[in-house]
Amino acid sequence: MATKAVCVLKGDNSPVKGIINFEQKERNGPVKVWGSIEGLTEGLHGFHVHEFGDNTVGCTSAGPHFNPLSRKHGGPKDEERHVGDLGNVTADKDGVASVSIEDSVISLSGDHCIIGRTLVVHEKADDLGKGGNEESTKTGNAGSRLACGVIGIAQ
């Protein structure tokens, strides 16, 4: 039986909002991630699962990227990456990003479970850990947190 989750993204003092869905058809199988985010500037925006499902002080309460394996930041296809590193979403000229990702590192159960954690869309492009400085190995230089939401169990 498939496991499903959903995240409603809301702007942290920004007009950014969206709905992102997650589905994992088998326990150790890939997770499909899809949905739409609006209110963005045109171009790439970092897209990560952060450690905590805490938005009490806005998106900053979510903590760092979800990284249970204590690795350096990377891209979604890299061996060396945080579990929560989902790369970038691309917004069109109207500020809308259509999201369609399949990821085999995140999970909806077990040690890499993202349910109850916060999904964040960032101000800038994620350099995927290749920016040549220390911040790149932690955050991908993706900048401030534009919008976030806690990932919850869905029907």
Curated annotation (Swiss-Prot):
Coiled coil: none annotated. Zn(2+) binds at H65, H73, H82, D85. The modification N-acetylalanine is found at A2. The gene is SOD1. It comes from Pongo pygmaeus (Bornean orangutan). Binds 1 copper ion per subunit. This is Superoxide dismutase [Cu-Zn]. It catalyses: 2 superoxide + 2 H(+) = H2O2 + O2. Cu cation binds at H48, H50, H65, H122. Its cofactor is Cu cation; Zn(2+). Disulfide bonds join C59-C148. Its main location: cytoplasm. Homodimer; non-disulfide-linked. Heterodimer with SOD1. The heterodimer CCS:SOD1 interacts with SLC31A1; this heterotrimer is Cu(1+)-mediated and its maintenance is regulated through SOD1 activation. Palmitoylation helps nuclear targeting and decreases catalytic activity. Succinylation, adjacent to copper catalytic site, probably inhibits activity. Desuccinylation by SIRT5 enhances activity. Its EC number is 1.15.1.1.
